[in-house]
Curated annotation (Swiss-Prot):
<keyword id="KW-0804">Transcription</keyword>
<keyword id="KW-0808">Transferase</keyword>
<dbReference type="InterPro" id="IPR011262">
    <property type="entry name" value="DNA-dir_RNA_pol_insert"/>
</dbReference>
<keyword id="KW-0548">Nucleotidyltransferase</keyword>
<dbReference type="GO" id="GO:0046983">
    <property type="term" value="F:protein dimerization activity"/>
</dbReference>
<dbReference type="InterPro" id="IPR011260">
    <property type="entry name" value="RNAP_asu_C"/>
</dbReference>
<dbReference type="GO" id="GO:0005737">
    <property type="term" value="C:cytoplasm"/>
</dbReference>
<dbReference type="InterPro" id="IPR011263">
    <property type="entry name" value="DNA-dir_RNA_pol_RpoA/D/Rpb3"/>
</dbReference>
<feature type="region of interest" description="Alpha C-terminal domain (alpha-CTD)">
    <location>
        <begin position="239"/>
        <end position="312"/>
    </location>
</feature>
<dbReference type="GO" id="GO:0003677">
    <property type="term" value="F:DNA binding"/>
</dbReference>
<dbReference type="GO" id="GO:0003899">
    <property type="term" value="F:DNA-directed RNA polymerase activity"/>
</dbReference>
<dbReference type="Pfam" id="PF03118">
    <property type="entry name" value="RNA_pol_A_CTD"/>
</dbReference>
<dbReference type="GO" id="GO:0000428">
    <property type="term" value="C:DNA-directed RNA polymerase complex"/>
</dbReference>
<dbReference type="InterPro" id="IPR036603">
    <property type="entry name" value="RBP11-like"/>
</dbReference>
<keyword id="KW-0240">DNA-directed RNA polymerase</keyword>
<dbReference type="GO" id="GO:0006351">
    <property type="term" value="P:DNA-templated transcription"/>
</dbReference>
<dbReference type="Pfam" id="PF01000">
    <property type="entry name" value="RNA_pol_A_bac"/>
</dbReference>
Length: 312
């Protein structure tokens, strides 16, 4: 079997502490670069465990549409700011951070006091602006998980009237792209492939660690196939994935794409999973730019749809 090398050719850390890594993998036999690229990308985008803010308690507030005296941002703005905080929790248990400030103050993520188990990655992310003579008191819940977890308002343990739930995005990977180059490296000039992979993390993990974890997950997935037995098992009824229940509004699409999908009776990710790329283009007033936007939004939550009906 052809032996290949893995080289990290670039590593950058942005102002928001997100990290970008670029890797070259090769030489590979024809077709192997696509296999590796697609498999790694799928695991990186939807299979890695991460940390996220899952709920916020604000003193004196019992619903998300309230305003807070002396605070410039309303409650919805504060919840959105908290949701966007990148955190790295080393605990498998619920971790709770607290913040108490008296204005005037520009409250940032680094002002939240957590235990030593939790690191706030992007400490300069703004949370709220408190005017002089006013107070703001927050309690922030952080948990570990995989993928996307929408708010479960039926769960009695998390439905306290003053505990404001947040749709949790545990994915530590923001973006993954790969390209494939052909190069002649063998005797006789036979063609080999080289995979170039770029991944961007939220800063809670490094690109190197993320790639290694994705590879280990794939090894664990394929290892049992090396010792296939003939034991007949009764197939279990698959449970619908949590991602399929995500409403269309949560994909943060442009107004044009959102309105076109709504008119086509598409209300959730589950509805979109029945479409191919060609189907999207047949929606009235829905062009290739809108279709690409939908594909990218679905891939952010680990879901892909076929290019055509025949490949579905």
């Amino acid at each position: 079997m052809l032996q290949y090398q893995i080289d990290r050719i670039d590593h950058q850390v942005s102002n928001d502490r997100s990290q970008t890594g670029v890797f070259l993998i090769g030489p590979l036999e024809r077709g192997q670069a696509t296999t590796l690229g697609n498999s790694l990308r799928r695991v990186l985008m939807g299979g890695l465990e991460g940390s996220a803010v899952t709920a916020v308690r604000i003193a004196g507030v019992n619903h998300e549409y309230a305003t807070i005296p002396g605070v410039r941002e309303d409650v919805l703005d504060i919840l959105l700011n908290c949701k966007q905080i990148s955190v790295d929790s080393r605990s498998q248990e619920l971790e709770i951070g607290r913040l108490v400030v008296t204005g005037p103050a520009d409250v940032k993520a680094k002002d939240i006091q957590f235990s030593s188990q939790v690191e706030v990655v992007d400490g300069d992310r703004p949370i709220a602006t408190v005017q002089e003579g006013h107070n703001l008191e927050l309690e922030i819940h952080v948990e570990r998980g995989v993928g996307y977890r929408p708010v479960d308002r039926k769960n009695e343990e998390t439905s306290a009237i003053d505990l404001l739930q947040i749709d949790a995005v545990f994915m530590p990977i923001n973006r993954v792209n790969f390209t494939i180059d052909e190069t002649a490296v063998a005797e006789g000039g036979s063609t080999r492939e080289r995979l170039k992979m770029e991944l961007v993390t939220d800063g809670s993990t490094s690109p190197d660690d993320a790639l290694a974890e994705a590879a280990n997950q794939l090894i664990e997935l394929f290892q049992p196939l090396a010792t296939v037995s003939m034991v007949e098992e009764i197939p279990e009824e698959p449970e619908p994935a949590a991602e399929a229940q995500i409403p269309l509004e949560e994909l943060n699409l442009s107004v044009r794409a959102y309105n076109c999908l709504k008119r086509a009776q598409v209300n959730s990710v589950s509805d979109l999973m029945g479409f191919s790329y060609e189907d999207l283009l047949e929606i009235k007033n829905f062009g290739s730019k809108s279709a690409d936007e939908v594909i990218e939004a679905l891939e952010r939550i680990g879901i892909s749809i076929p290019q055509s009906r025949t490949s579905a």
